[in-house]
Amino acid sequence: MVKSFQGVRMAEPKKAPIPQILVKEYMSTNLITFKPDDTIDQVMEVFSKRKISGAPVVDASGALIGIISEVDCLKEIIKGKYTNTPKFPGKVSEHMTTDVITLSPDLSIFDAASQFLEHKIRRFPVMKDGRLLGQISLSDIIRAFPTLRQTTW
């Protein structure tokens, strides 16, 4: 009795998973933060010296409560023009954004890039288990580009 011969079969090569490039690989972890009682004067001085455009606002326990940006500071500058104030005594708590969107450190850079496009903002705090781990900016995503070009998508 002869059994049918099916011939030589090649084993299908397993496709290697596409390596994920994650937010945690490109986020900044050495953050400059502000307190709600800091003045806009103080914020603008730090922004200018450190060449940054925004930073997280944290409470006494280090919990994220908002974001302060150059745009937020403009509100105080404009107010100062009308009151003829050379200093900007307004508090961070009066101008910060409190409805903060955060990203996970385990989110892919591609998904993070989509969030930048969707929300039209320049930075996201990175949080895990309610703890502020860092921040990722639009320029961090751009910095990841050479690595992104080497992946197959």
Task: Tell me what each language-model feature is.
Residues M1-W153:
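Tandem CBS (Cystathionine beta-synthase) repeat/Bateman regulatory domains
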